């Protein structure tokens, strides 16, 4: 008895013909800190830490690094904290980044608010000093003082099962802001936009 043979290269094969493999879009992420870098590397993303001090300086450095890259990417992102940046400087920095082809995932006040959205929606301003107590209810060994690539990777491992909730909660808080001027946002992050994009690029 002869073994069955299947010609997988035949154009008449319906399985082969109808199968579509989505193309992953390439992306590079400039991050203000190493914690963010460690977190986003868990999405198998290319990351580069940007040093600059003020938000405007960070944007300027990201633009320089983008121009010095050896290859092109489909998307360029910058992850940055608003911190104490004035509304005028904040909007100027955002506009400068976008004019140079860099999308900005910003957090008001700091990136760690993204951790909070994994557990609940935030409807009012949360003092960054209160982040730790809330997060420790779910990640018991968490410390706000722990920073760095390993800390970012650790938080990804601890929280990635709640990713859909975090995206939904952060999107809801963003959409409910009473002003359309992002410079006056409080306890909001647009990191969910970047994470949503990366999550859709992951192979399953």
What spans do the regions from the language model cover?
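A short, well-structured beta->alpha microelement
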Residues: 51-67
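Hydrophobic "anchor" residues on beta-strands that sit immediately upstream
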Residues: 28, 77
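C-terminal accessory helical subdomains adjacent to catalytic cores in phosphodiester-
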Residues: 2-8, 13-24, 37-50, 68-75, ...
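Helix N-cap/beta->alpha junction signal
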Residues: 32-33
């Amino acid at each position: 008895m002869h073994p069955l043979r299947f010609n997988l290269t035949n154009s008449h094969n319906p399985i082969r013909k109808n199968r579509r493999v989505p193309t992953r879009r390439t992306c590079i992420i400039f991050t203000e800190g190493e914690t963010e870098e460690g977190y986003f590397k868990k999405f198998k993303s290319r990351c580069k830490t940007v040093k600059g001090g003020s938000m405007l300086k960070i944007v300027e450095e990201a633009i320089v690094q983008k121009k010095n890259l050896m290859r092109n990417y489909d998307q360029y992102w910058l992850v940055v904290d608003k911190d104490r940046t004035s509304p005028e400087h904040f909007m100027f920095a955002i506009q400068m980044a976008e004019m140079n082809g860099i999308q900005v995932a910003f957090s008001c006040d700091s990136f760690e608010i993204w951790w909070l959205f994994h557990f609940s929606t935030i409807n009012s301003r949360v003092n960054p000093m209160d982040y730790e107590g809330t997060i420790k209810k779910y990640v018991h060994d968490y410390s706000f003082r722990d920073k760095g690539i390993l800390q970012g990777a650790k938080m990804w491992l601890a929280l990635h099962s709640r990713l859909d909730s975090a995206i939904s909660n952060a999107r809801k808080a963003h959409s409910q802001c009473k002003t359309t001027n992002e410079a006056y946002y409080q306890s909001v992050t647009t990191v969910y936009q970047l994470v949503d994009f990366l999550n859709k690029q992951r192979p399953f």
